[in-house]
Regions:
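Extracellular/periplasmic Venus flytrap/periplasmic-binding protein
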Residues: 1-103
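Surface-exposed patches in mature extracellular/periplasmic domains of secreted proteins
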Residues: 14-19, 44, 120, 174-177, ...
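Active-site proximal loops enriched in glycine and acidic residues that flank catalytic Cys/His/Asp
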Residues: 18, 100, 124-127, 148, ...
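Bacterial peptidoglycan biogenesis and beta-lactam-recognition machinery
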Residues: 38, 116-117, 194-198
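Short hydrophobic alpha-helix segments
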Residues: 45-46, 235-237
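Extracellular/periplasmic periplasmic-binding protein-like sensory domains
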Residues: 62-73, 91-93, 109-182
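Segments of small-molecule ligand-sensing domains
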Residues: 165-235
């Protein structure tokens, strides 16, 4: 879905940043395959490990390290007196596809700005948002577009309010598991209607649900953007 959003926004050159774990690498490969099939171009694929400094990976993605290396070579040949150097980032990236949790995202987005890439659109997976309205903490995520479940995004849902008041509050993955349970219950009563084509979609807690010709359930997530530290519903086209 992130690939479709980026493509419809007119972007064609993608950079991918993901954690260095097998399950995330599979997601990276899936996104890359979808993007290339659309006719897009991948200009950078990078991974990170750990929870500390993201400078190296961002410098690599934006080719800042190459710019610094060229400057060092030049300075080795010329007198260094009164010479100043400002690194330049590559200019062929239309957007960045990011897989990260909120803590990682809060470090990666400002690091992009530090390395002259704060103007590049960032599209992320649902993992970037834990469902908590930490406005001050989430300021560092401003501008990131991501897809997520309506249940996580909509804090005013009457059923969510009722469940939250009667059960232990949860966040992140547990919120999403709760939403899956709700949709499983709702879908069971509607499977015959789907099969008989009496309905073609159902607005669920995990997204807009539909059934393919071979009986597979698909879902379309809501689109959101961080604005002033708040996850706000955004246009899906």
């Amino acid at each position: 879905q992130a690939a479709t959003l980026a493509w419809n926004a007119g972007h064609r050159n993608a950079a991918i940043i993901t954690p260095q774990a097998d399950n995330y690498l599979r997601l990276q490969n899936t996104f890359a395959e979808i993007w290339l099939n659309k006719g897009g171009r991948l200009v950078s694929r990078s991974t990170f490990s750990g929870e500390n400094d993201y400078s190296d990976v961002i410098k690599r993605v934006m080719a800042i390290d190459s710019s610094e290396a060229r400057a060092d070579s030049l300075l080795d040949l010329l007198p260094r007196t009164n010479m100043e150097f400002t690194p330049r980032r590559r200019n062929d990236i239309d957007f960045i596809f990011l897989i990260a949790n909120p803590g990682q995202g809060r470090q990666i987005k400002p690091t992009l700005a530090f390395y002259f890439a704060g103007d590049i659109p960032v599209y992320a997976t649902a993992s970037i948002y834990d469902g908590l309205n930490n406005q001050s903490t989430n300021q560092d995520l401003n501008g990131i577009v991501f897809t997520t479940e309506p249940w996580v995004l909509n804090s005013s849902d009457p059923l969510k309010t009722e469940i939250t008041s009667n059960l232990r509050p949860v966040q992140g993955t547990l919120q999403r598991l709760r939403a899956m349970g709700i949709d499983s219950f709702r879908l069971y009563a509607r499977l015959r209607q789907f099969a008989d084509k009496e309905i073609d979609s159902l607005q669920g807690a995990t997204g807009t649900l539909s059934m393919s010709e071979n009986g597979i359930i698909h879902r379309n997530l809501d689109v959101a953007r961080f604005v002033n530290g708040i996850a706000t519903e955004a246009e899906s086209s």
